């Protein structure tokens, strides 16, 4: 007898998610000083988080033996002010925005229900859908049009069994945004939940705010996170903006104490530090411009415009994306090989923003490999 006989078949078919490489791993494998490694593989904030957070964490440490409040009223008030959305339309989750995704799966998905996922995009949508037994219908971001969303490929997949449509904008890993009118067209074509992932929206240079859709329609949920511009990826906290009806359903089934006391303190402090937020956002956009302009100089690479904190780069010098990444690793630079992104055929890597000095060093190192 063996426990293997009791494991769900879908779980047996899964391979464990492989995250971006850490500085510590590369330091060990390539005998490089960790302080000299340039990490551009995980879409993190290279400037860290608000300097005010450390002091607030120290104040909270005496209380960590106590359970956190499931709904922290101070955090909800700060989020409401930051988003200009009533707090009754906001739900906060631990584990970044992933908990929000998982909670909606619990609420909506029965076995053999359908979800629509335009690809290439964030892998977590597919993983969650499969775990809950959904059938995935793939739409597409059109490579021939710089990965613009093929709206018809979404609309043509909508059926009575469609429960969730995922729209990542700016899209990961391509960096482009989806036209607002196209999103509203999709919303008006279905009663399924349209989940709009806005993890990187603060880096967009365009006037692009879709929160009105979450108040106008009862089948829209907008995902936001503290992991990027706020620099709190290690605290794992995200939130959703949606109808009061959906908030009510989510509060019935989401984990009760998933947002730790320290995560709540970090989020509150980050929201209050407006100066850091603006500098982090503006420096991130400037870093993107440095990388984009620098990468365009290499004729052996094709770089795509981006409204996020990363760039999609096609390797066209005869190397595979894996070989390209290894050559960078040998020189202490981490970027993301995009082979794991379904629907992205070819040799692509994703390069996230660094500090201005890291950007400069990366572009210099790149000359050794590409040229």
Curated annotation (Swiss-Prot):
Documented EC number(s): 2.6.1.9
Pfam families reported in the protein's UniProt record: Aminotran_1_2
Entry keyword annotation includes Ribosomal protein: no
InterPro entries: Aminotransferase_I/II_large (IPR004839), HisP_aminotrans (IPR005861), PyrdxlP-dep_Trfase (IPR015424), PyrdxlP-dep_Trfase_major (IPR015421), PyrdxlP-dep_Trfase_small (IPR015422)
Cofactor list: pyridoxal 5'-phosphate
One annotated GO biological process: L-histidine biosynthetic process
Signal peptide: none
Chemical reaction(s) catalysed: L-histidinol phosphate + 2-oxoglutarate = 3-(imidazol-4-yl)-2-oxopropyl phosphate + L-glutamate
Gene3D superfamilies for the chain: Aspartate Aminotransferase, domain 1 (3.90.1150.10), Type I PLP-dependent aspartate aminotransferase-like (Major domain) (3.40.640.10)
Protein name: Histidinol-phosphate aminotransferase
Source species of the chain: Methanococcus aeolicus (strain ATCC BAA-1280 / DSM 17508 / OCM 812 / Nankai-3)
Lineage: Archaea, Methanobacteriati, Methanobacteriota, Methanomada group, Methanococci
Gene that specifies this protein: hisC
